[in-house]
Amino acid sequence: LKLKQIDGSDFDLDTLKGKKVYLKFMRFASCMFCNLEVNHLKNKHNEFGNNFEIVLVFHSSVENLKKQMKKHGPLPFTVVADPDFSYYKKYEIERSMGKLINSFIFKLPRALSAILKGYIPIKIEGYLDIATADFFLDKNGVVLDIKYSLKDSFDGFEFSEIKEFSLR
């Protein structure tokens, strides 16, 4: 996986060999649920183990992603842009309008929390109907576990699972 980071520099997933990685394919940069997740991961980052990295992939241009992530301040993990959707296809990330609708039905309290934090997607740049997906990679870059969204667009690993993986 080779993409641009929010500062415009190149990122290569292979540079993280030797570390465990939580790789998450998000939706578009202004997605309210995604921004809530970024905020949560930033606030809980000190609970993760050593030798562990988080990489978040957004279907967005670098410019838009940088603008949207600015509200979070400095982030202790890697955020990259895949404006062409190429790695989403390679990793078989699904697009589903049904799962998007289910997200608002099943995750209404989460949506309200995002709105209260000001994560309102005024400008949508990217596919609206991406069903997120989570990957745990071992120190050699081998996929250990995958969680594709099943019932809604944000059906990924729970925080407790991510934390446990980071501490193993």
What are these regions (language model features)?
Residues 10, 17-19, 51, 131:
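A structure-centric signal for secondary-structure junctions around beta-strands
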Residues 14-42:
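Short active-site neighborhood of thiol/selenol oxidoreductases, capturing the structured segment around
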